[in-house]
């Protein structure tokens, strides 16, 4: 079953986080009444607090019903010596490649690109850099720059914003 691998991948993309951090999530990371994830990122030990959308929240509730008897949100589906443990990064990659192949997706897809894709999509949507940083855990704008890609969508957004401001200026009467 690839269910838990799928959940790890979905959470990484949804929240723009590293696969390694998602595979290690425990139930204590989820604040159910606030629909919020608390995460201390492994790379720099930065804390992020992320909202849990309705669809993902429903998935996590179902996951809790099925796997709530142990610590990890998405452990390996078979216990190792009677204990449920997180997937290794190697196994996440191996099983994800199987899913990619079974789904008929391009083999060059890489899980490590999910975080960069999420950050690029936030930028393309016009999300201010400080808000992107609150999701990604970066502490300065320069560290986010490598994720910011010059895409048609972001150029289109920028020019449309500029043009809408010109229209506003024309419609504003001066004294």
Task: Indicate residue ranges for each PLM-predicted region.
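Catalytic-site neighborhood detector that most strongly recognizes the C-terminal catalytic loop/helix
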Residues: 41-45, 136-161
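Short, polar N-cap/turn motifs at the start of nucleic acid-interacting alpha helices
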Residues: 29-34, 106, 127-148, 170-174
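Conserved tyrosine-mediated DNA breakage-rejoining catalytic core shared by Y-recombinases
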Residues: 15-20, 24-65
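C-terminal catalytic core of Y-nucleophile DNA break-rejoin enzymes
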Residues: 42-62, 70-97
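Basic, Lys/Arg- and aromatic-enriched nucleic-acid-binding interface segment
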Residues: 1-19, 23, 115
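Short basic/aromatic active-site micro-motif
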Residues: 4, 106-126
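C-terminal secondary-structure termini that scaffold catalytic or DNA-interacting sites
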Residues: 78-81, 161-175
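Short alpha-helical segment immediately N-terminal to, or the first helix within
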Residues: 11-12, 25, 121-122, 135, ...
